[in-house]
Amino acid sequence: MDGLHSILEKAVESPSHWQVLLDASASLWRYSGGNVALLMMQMAQRGTDEPTLVAGFKEWERHGRNVLRGEHALWVIAPRTARVQQVLLPDGTRHRIPVGDKAPNGAVDEGKKTLITGWRGQAVFDVSQTEGTPLLVPRSAGLTSVEVPRLWESLAGVARAHGFSVQVTDSQFGLTSGFTDFAQHRVQVGGWLNPEERAAVLAHELGHVLLHGPNDNVGKLYGSSVDHRGLAEVEAESVAYTVLKAHGIDRGPQSASYLSGWADAVIEAEHSAAGVTSRKEPASRVDIAKSVLGRVTAASKEILEVTDPPGLGGKVPAAEASLQVEGQETYAGVKPAQEPSRGLEISGP
């Protein structure tokens, strides 16, 4: 795992390397941050391009594509799952039993659930390692003036789903572009901003909503909660960058240099605490980078599942496999009059 360690270390050291991780996370947003980094590491070790669309051997076959002879699998971490039946016992407690087992007397069946019981390695292949039927993958050429309000509404819907109202105002706290008030469950966005800027600010504030509430125990553990405001800002801005990038909006180089400075500050504080009152092993820079990447990608995925950007998020099953490119107006191979293509035909070698 030296390669993975190196990727995370560089991400802490260099804003450009952090941006590369975020760009990959935007393309592969259906994957966890850890798996994105794993895929990037393995492709880099082979001297090939970054992964764009990955799937298992049989999944590629279902879409009319075959893995090229001699290609070696990429590996990601996948959950082991088990189906169980949840029952409510007479004393009010809940109990889970294997599906098919007899429930205790007096128990009320509450239905079946899928539980994660462990983790395993799963072999996948990038589209560049396959050949066969072209995959027609929608992509964004940037949001139009019509699409920006739709993005805004879907982002506001995420806020409402978490119990926050969204206000566009010229008089919010500190006259900042955006502000999240956890006490009032309210997100405020500057009324002087143009529609695209408002969407960007709202995406940033959603990063705070999803990651930095008063019960953010993971953030406190790794120094990225509101107790370490600079690193919390890096997380929120990274969420905004990833979400907007997935929608075809490039926010430019991120200020990931903050990550290095705040990671060092957290480590120094933990070293001091460890020498006085705590026996906890201080976090390393890579531990902090791993935590931030995982939190950012998890929050981004939750948002993107609602905003539904073009593309497949790096996973194949939702792709349309077809020998016919013609007639698909939103796919590559067809350029509507006076308009650029808004799709990508991936056909491999």
Locate each region found by the language model.
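N-terminal accessory/interface modules of nucleic-acid-binding and processing proteins
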Residues: 1-347
